[in-house]
């Protein structure tokens, strides 16, 4: 059998499918673009959904790709098994309404078995199929597959809610009896038993039905366009070709493991327990790629996932004896392994290393904070007389502070406490269920719209025009084509149009359709791209219109001009962000409306006030310099040579539009813009905020709206000046600071008075010393506002030799708080409070020198105080 590197496998896959007329789709960003159903790109088909649901018609219906993907619903299994990964590569081939079952199976078999390609031994391949799908069974038989190698399984039907669905046929490679220690054999496949012998290497989904949850599967309707969706895991193929026992011994992971060996001084033993090595190697791959694609560690969403991965890897580093930040040192190795197809990791290496190292250092501080939380938690439990740490608290230590259960167990054991493991596992399961529920499987598609997909008439958007005459080519009303319509809403396609279809963050034009006499026959309320790319006008009709007639199309120029100002300002803002906070601040989303612009970008912290000031100043400088805005059409290679910034996630054809603003900004953009930056007038940032982990948002205004914003601020400042009796606006800051200083002085004075009062009260309490069995003690009820004040009393008591034991009781609201402190080796504070607390219907516990309890019966406070002497 061939011995192939991972790069050779990937290239051979793409070359084979190119030979079958497929176009290669580049690997997309791991952060989904315009798809809120996905946390991550989690399969090869996830980026092709627009083709499968018919909302966009691809240039070539045959597509192949090698797609980096992330799945995180089973993080805890990574490192425990031979094949679980967070980040992996999915190799795929796809047919959008072109070839179907026969070709997919035949070509798949050719790729797997031909000496020119993978050359797998045929007797090592097994296939599963859906029992009712005899067409697939017969196709495999026709290709020479033995019937004993074809296994029917009920699970071989791909379906997620409503939408495209169908049977699938999976291909397995038999690794032999060495991987079947109990000699179970083919039953491993037949009974779907988890095993290391029969490795699934490829799944071919035959998408031929529109699933409808309301009817039985046998009544599903056939899709108008049948599709092929396949996926093969590169890591699994590499393990087979390289004769590796697990995926981790392949050229995709082993170089990382070797680096970890150097850092830790430990040795990776293929036959031993190497979980920590595997976790680190897997997680740093996911971190490197995800951060390189713009996701950053944080407390929610994608950021939470990355933070969890980093902390898990860091904890496993500690298990290997690594005490300093080290994960960032592995980024270069990841980049070197993947450079041939994914150069972006090395290109962004410095930034990725900076983020990873910073997060490692932050985690070290968090571990310290977590230890404090754990100690306080156990103090509280002791005060309440409890000895078991609740499962949800264990989960919080694990989830928030990165404490592995073993670490929490060690801390608890030191305090004589146990763990609620069942509760922890329940909390963990809840989190996993939430994670799974938030992820829609990558292949999930919407229903196909056959009517819109069938529109093939050509239509051209004409730049620079606000009105023109056009022939009406298509009318769609009530989801059906018609020759004429007179009322309600309809979708229209013209042979040409001045209306911009919503795209690239720029909203659609609004306007009117007029007849030959100048009367308005329809109001355009939206324009979107049809599946084949034509501008599709949504209109409200006020008169009858017919296909073949000529109409005048007029856009609302005021709306267009406002949008253009904001769109050009967005380009200036993007460039300013690069210059001031770094080139990592790339666009993550934008909206250019008539009255404002919204720009989302990747950044790992809030933009400071000073940075915002510099950004605003720099953008306005470009506006006031009156720079011509030049748009040219060219090929993509020339555009890149010009230094044009391409937005990750946008798909560009061979011909592109390049928008240049002097030497300040060069971007690929299909939108409309002002002719000169001076037309923008002025630019003002209204707000900067975080909208998710690693993503910031700026909302800004231009022109008239910016003037109004400045005027509103001036009016507000005048109102403040009047309130604080400042004669001039420019004196407001000094006046406010003077008032603030007065407040601070009064607060200090108030605090000092409180401290004197507390000291006086403590002095009175500490004078009342009694004796019982040779032990000096103080037992008193005090008036305090919170339990913390009791500790302050105790701290003051410890500083001088007032007595051997202190017992304080306070009624706070409807609760009774009890504190016992002891300097005597004969009196254990924790034991004493366990006796006293029940008197006030409470319970508690603690250490020998300090203990606290809570109760509810304030009427028994004096009884408690009277009983102290009898218990010393």
From Swiss-Prot:
One record GO biological process: alanyl-tRNA aminoacylation
Keyword annotations of the record: Aminoacyl-tRNA synthetase, ATP-binding, Cytoplasm, Ligase, Metal-binding, Nucleotide-binding, Protein biosynthesis, RNA-binding, tRNA-binding, Zinc
Cofactor binding note: Binds 1 zinc ion per subunit.
Keyword Nucleotide-binding appears in the UniProt entry: yes
EC number: 6.1.1.7
Gene Ontology cellular component annotations, sorted alphabetically: cytosol
Catalyzed chemical reaction(s): tRNA(Ala) + L-alanine + ATP = L-alanyl-tRNA(Ala) + AMP + diphosphate
Cofactor(s) this protein cannot do without: Zn(2+)
GO molecular function (one): aminoacyl-tRNA deacylase activity
SUPFAM superfamilies referenced in this protein's UniProt entry, alphabetically: Class II aaRS and biotin synthetases, Putative anticodon-binding domain of alanyl-tRNA synthetase (AlaRS), ThrRS/AlaRS common domain, Translation proteins
Pfam family, one: tRNA-synt_2c
Record-linked InterPro entries: aa-tRNA-synth_II/BPL/LPL, Ala-tRNA-lgiase_IIc, Ala-tRNA-ligase_IIc_anticod-bd, Ala-tRNA-synth_IIc_core, Ala-tRNA-synth_IIc_N, Ala-tRNA_ligase, Ala_tRNA_ligase_euk/bac, DHHA1_dom
Binding site for Zn(2+): 567, 571, 669, 673
TM region(s), chain numbering: none
Keyword Metal-binding included in the entry's annotation: yes
SMART domains per the UniProt record, alphabetical: tRNA_SAD (SM00863)
Subcellular compartments: Cytoplasm
General function of this protein: Catalyzes the attachment of alanine to tRNA(Ala) in a two-step reaction: alanine is first activated by ATP to form Ala-AMP and then transferred to the acceptor end of tRNA(Ala). Also edits incorrectly charged Ser-tRNA(Ala) and Gly-tRNA(Ala) via its editing domain.
PANTHER family, alphabetized: ALANINE--TRNA LIGASE, CYTOPLASMIC (PTHR11777:SF9), ALANYL-TRNA SYNTHETASE (PTHR11777)
NCBIfam families noted in UniProt: alaS
Domain text: Consists of three domains; the N-terminal catalytic domain, the editing domain and the C-terminal C-Ala domain. The editing domain removes incorrectly charged amino acids, while the C-Ala domain, along with tRNA(Ala), serves as a bridge to cooperatively bring together the editing and aminoacylation centers thus stimulating deacylation of misacylated tRNAs.
Family: Belongs to the class-II aminoacyl-tRNA synthetase family.
Protein name listed in UniProt: Alanine--tRNA ligase
Biological source species: Streptococcus suis (strain 98HAH33)
Lineage of source species: Bacteria, Bacillati, Bacillota, Bacilli, Lactobacillales
Primary gene name: alaS
């Amino acid at each position: 059998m061939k011995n192939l590197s991972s790069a050779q496998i990937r290239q051979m896959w793409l070359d084979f499918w190119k030979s079958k007329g497929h176009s290669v789709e580049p690997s997309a960003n791991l952060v989904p673009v315009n798809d809120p159903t996905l946390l991550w790109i989690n399969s090869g088909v996830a980026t092709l959904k627009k083709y499968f649901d018919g909302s966009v018609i691809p240039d070539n219906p045959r597509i192949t790709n090698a797609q980096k993907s992330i799945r995180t619903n089973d993080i805890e299994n990574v490192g425990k098994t031979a094949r679980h990964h967070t980040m992996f590569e999915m190799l795929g081939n796809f047919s959008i309404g072109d070839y179907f079952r026969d070709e997919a199976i035949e070509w798949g078999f050719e790729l797997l078995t031909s000496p020119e390609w993978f050359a797998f031994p045929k007797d090592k391949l097994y296939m599963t199929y859906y029992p009712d799908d005899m067409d697939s069974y017969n196709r495999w038989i026709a290709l020479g597959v033995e019937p004993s190698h074809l296994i029917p399984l009920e699970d071989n039907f791909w379906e997620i809610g409503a939408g495209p669905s169908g049977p699938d046929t999976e291909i397995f490679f038999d690794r032999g009896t060495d991987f079947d220690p109990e000699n179970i054999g083919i039953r491993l496949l037949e009974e779907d038993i988890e095993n290391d012998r029969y490795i699934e290497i490829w799944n071919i989904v035959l998408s031929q039905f529109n699933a409808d949850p309301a009817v039985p599967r046998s009544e599903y309707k056939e899709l108008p366009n049948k599709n092929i969706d396949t996926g093969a895991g590169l890591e699994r193929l590499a393990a087979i070709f390289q004769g590796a026992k697990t995926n981790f011994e392949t050229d995709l992971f082993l170089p990382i493991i070797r680096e970890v060996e150097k850092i830790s001084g430990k040795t990776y033993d293929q036959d031993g327990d190497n979980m920590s090595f595997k976790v680190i190697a897997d997680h740093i791959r996911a971190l490197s790629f995800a951060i390189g694609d713009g996701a950053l560690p944080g407390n929610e969403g994608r950021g939470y996932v990355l933070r969890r991965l980093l902390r898990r890897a860091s904890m496993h580093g500690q298990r290997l004896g690594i005490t300093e930040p080290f994960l960032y040192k592995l980024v270069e190795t990841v980049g070197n392994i993947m450079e041939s197809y994914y150069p972006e990791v090395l290109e962004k290496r410095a930034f990725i290393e900076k983020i990873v190292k910073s997060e490692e250092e932050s985690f070290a501080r968090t571990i310290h904070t977590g230890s404090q939380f754990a100690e306080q938690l156990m103090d509280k439990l002791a005060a309440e007389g409890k000895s078991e740490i609740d499962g949800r608290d264990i989960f919080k230590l694990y989830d928030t502070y990165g404490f592995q259960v073993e670490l929490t167990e060690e801390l608890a054991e030191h305090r004589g406490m146990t763990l609620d493991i069942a509760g922890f596992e329940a909390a963990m399961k809840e989190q996993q269920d939430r994670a799974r529920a938030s992820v829609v499987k990558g292949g999930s598609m919407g229903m196909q719209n056959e009517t819109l997909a069938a529109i093939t008439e050509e239509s051209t958007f004409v730049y620079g025009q606000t009105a023109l005459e056009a022939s009406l080519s298509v009318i769609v009303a009530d989801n059906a084509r018609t020759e004429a319509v007179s009322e309600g809403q309809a979708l229209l396609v013209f042979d040409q149009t001045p209306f911009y279809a919503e795209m690239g963050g720029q909203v659609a034009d609004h306007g009117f359709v007029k007849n030959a006499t100048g009367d308005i026959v329809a109001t355009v309320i939206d324009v979107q791209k049809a599946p084949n790319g034509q501008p599709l006008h949504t209109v409200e009709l006020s008169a009858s219109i017919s296909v073949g007639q000529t109409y005048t199309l007029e856009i609302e120029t005021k709306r267009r001009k406002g949008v253009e100002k904001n769109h050009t300002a967005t380009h200036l803002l993007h460039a300013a962000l690069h210059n001031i906070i770094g080139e990592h601040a790339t666009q993550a989303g934008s909206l250019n409306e008539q009255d404002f612009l919204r720009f989302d970008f990747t950044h790992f912290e809030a933009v400071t006030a000073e940075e915002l000031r510099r950004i605003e100043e720099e953008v306005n400088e470009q506006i006031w310099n009156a720079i011509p805005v030049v748009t040219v059409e060219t090929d993509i290679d020339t555009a890149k040579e010009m230094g044009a910034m391409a937005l990750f996630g946008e798909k560009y054809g061979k011909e592109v539009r390049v928008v240049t603003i002097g030497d300040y900004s060069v971007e690929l953009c299909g939108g409309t813009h002002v002719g000169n930056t001076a037309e923008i007038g002025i630019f003002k940032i209204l707000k900067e905020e975080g909208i998710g982990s690693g993503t910031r948002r700026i909302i800004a205004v231009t022109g008239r709206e910016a003037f109004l914003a400045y005027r509103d601020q001036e009016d507000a400042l005048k109102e403040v000046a009047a309130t604080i009796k400042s004669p001039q606006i420019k004196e407001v800051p000094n006046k406010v600071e003077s008032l603030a200083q007065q407040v601070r002085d009064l607060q200090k004075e108030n605090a000092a008075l409180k401290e004197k009062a507390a000291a006086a009260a403590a002095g009175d309490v500490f004078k009342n010393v009694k004796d019982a069995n040779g032990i000096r003690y103080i037992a008193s009820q005090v008036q305090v506002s919170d339990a913390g004040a009791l500790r302050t009393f105790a701290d003051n008591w410890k500083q001088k030799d007032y007595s051997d034991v202190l017992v304080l009781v306070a009624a706070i609201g409807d609760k009774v708080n009890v504190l016992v402190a002891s300097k005597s080796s004969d009196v254990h504070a924790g034991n004493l409070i366990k006796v006293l607390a029940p008197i006030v219907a409470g319970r508690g516990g603690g250490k020998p020198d300090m203990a606290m309890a809570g109760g509810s019966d304030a009427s028994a406070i004096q009884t408690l105080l009277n009983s102290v002497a009898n218990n010393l």
